[in-house]
Structures are given as C-alpha cells and as structure tokens.
Amino acid sequence: MELKIVNPGGAQGTVNVSEVAFGREFNQDLVHQAVVAYMAGARQGTKAQKTRAEVSGGGKKPWRQKGTGRARAGTIRSPIWRGGGVTFAAKPRDFEQKLNRKMYRAALQCILSELNRQDRLIVVESFDVDAPKTKALVQKLAQYDLTDALIVTEDLSENLYLASRNLHKVGVSDVQGVDPVSLIGYDKVVVTVPALKKFEEILG
C-alpha cells in the first residue's frame, strides 16, 4: 500500500509501506489491553499504610474490661480509633501485567493502521529544527498546520527534544520509544520516512 508524503510547499509524493503494519483491521479489545497493560506497568506501586499490628504503641489495654461504663477496648491502635491502624492497609505492589510480544506488536499495528484510516498519520521526508528553540518548532509545525502532534523520527535529535519540552500538546520520540498511549494521545502523529521504514522492520 502507498502513503502520501506531505511537504510544506504543498507538493506530495508517496511511499510504499507494508499492508501488515499500516493496513491491519482495528481490534479494539487488543488495543485496550495493550494500553491498560502499559499504564499499569508505569504505576509506581510504592503506596504503603500500617495495619494495627504495625502502628507503634497500643500494647496496653487502655482501661479495664468492666465497670467503667465505657465501651470495651483492648488497644488504642484499633482501626476505629484516631491514630489507629488501617483495616485493609495498602502495601507496595507490582501492577505490571503480562502482554505477549506478538500481542503488543499487533496492537501497535492496529493503532498505526487506524491513525492512517482517520487521516491522523502524517508522513514527512524529515523533521528537525536548527536550534533548540520552542519558537523554531512552533514555526515548523505551523508549516503543516499542526498544534497537537506526536513527532516520531528515526533518531531523536537533541534540538528537537529541547525545543518540544515547553509545548504540552507536542511530543517527540524515536521509533523505539513509541508506545500505545502516546500514539493515541495526540491529535496527529507525524512520522518521517526513515522512521516509517523502521516501523516496518519492527512490525512488518
């Protein structure tokens, strides 16, 4: 299959790409699973609370069992007391979900194919800026009429990375750094021709 190459001057060319990588039928369940697995793996998982056994103090019975008129109590660290332990205390855990390599690759194929069908995938010959300046990148994006985009290049240049840091609706990545969440999180995805070929090698 062929994809159009967009140039700032308006002239357009084409590039041949794999039908497998860019013409796959969309599988919503698979993409959902890949996105959930990726986001779960990104969780820090360091939350920790103390149970009644772990809170310091509370070893002595606060008052005798009978005769005071008050409710019976065995420890001041009961979960129903202020300063007591937590009933079902959260503990550090690993939220990572297993996703087979073939499934992950297929999910990326589905996303790229759907972006292409929705005209959200923009192929360009190359994309870079001469200086690490936000203004330079904004001007470059304006040539393609873009304000919300992920830019994917074969090798991420330092100038492009530094220029994009102050634009919260613009992301940059090399092919290896692309993930399902970033691909679906932007309005458009700009891919250079060398990056496109690398995608084919990995996914095709």
From Swiss-Prot:
Residues 47-69 are annotated as: Disordered. The keyword Chaperone does not apply. It comes from the Bacteria. The keyword Cell membrane does not apply. One of its GO terms (molecular function) is rRNA binding. Gene3D superfamilies: 3.40.1370.10. Part of the 50S ribosomal subunit. One of the primary rRNA binding proteins, this protein initially binds near the 5'-end of the 23S rRNA. It is important during the early stages of 50S assembly. It makes multiple contacts with different domains of the 23S rRNA in the assembled 50S subunit and ribosome. This is Large ribosomal subunit protein uL4. It comes from Cellvibrio japonicus (strain Ueda107). The gene is rplD.
